[in-house]
Amino acid sequence: MNNKLIYRSVRFATHNSQLLLPPLVLYRRILRQHKLLPGPQREMGDQYVRNEFKLHKDIDNPLHIVGFLASWQDYLHMISNGKWKDATLSSETLEKLSPEQTVQLYELMKETQKLHQDNEIESSKDVKRNNKD
């Protein structure tokens, strides 16, 4: 992302009554906040954030830049407040997704379900081990 264009695009943009954070600051804060997540969620979240920021580093459309940063800033607030476990998407938000975004969301959902199942299996193994001792 071109820094001049970003700052020009974001300069007056507000979201939830706050100025949008510059991309690098936002990226670092998200990764720092991920350190508080359980291991598997942290790994998956870090990888996803890195990929998304890499994929969007060359965008030059001001509306896309503001939308991208606003969405990630909302995510940062959600995980900072511990609301990530109960988060849901509204039907309005789902309808606004492009076909590519819908596929990406579906893949993310499958990965999180797999992660959840793996965690349950590990937990049951731990319980069995503790019962044997």
From Swiss-Prot:
Coiled coil: none annotated. Residues 1-12 form a transit peptide. GO terms for biological process: carbon utilization; mitochondrial respiratory chain complex II assembly; regulation of gluconeogenesis; succinate metabolic process. It holds the Pfam family Complex1_LYR_2. GO terms for cellular component: mitochondrial intermembrane space; mitochondrial matrix; mitochondrion. It is found in: Mitochondrion; Mitochondrion intermembrane space; Mitochondrion matrix. Its main location: mitochondrion. InterPro entries: SDHAF3/Sdh7. The keyword Ubl conjugation does not apply. Keywords: Chaperone, Mitochondrion, Transit peptide. Signal peptide: none annotated. The keyword Chaperone applies. It comes from the Eukaryota. Disulfide bonds: none annotated. Interacts with SDH2 within an SDH1-SDH2 subcomplex. Belongs to the complex I LYR family. SDHAF3 subfamily. Plays an essential role in the assembly of succinate dehydrogenase (SDH), an enzyme complex (also referred to as respiratory complex II) that is a component of both the tricarboxylic acid (TCA) cycle and the mitochondrial electron transport chain, and which couples the oxidation of succinate to fumarate with the reduction of ubiquinone (coenzyme Q) to ubiquinol. Promotes maturation of the iron-sulfur protein subunit SDH2 of the SDH catalytic dimer, protecting it from the deleterious effects of oxidants. Acts together with SDHAF1 (SDH6). Present with 195 molecules/cell in log phase SD medium. This is Succinate dehydrogenase assembly factor 3, mitochondrial. It comes from Saccharomyces cerevisiae (strain ATCC 204508 / S288c). The gene is SDH7.
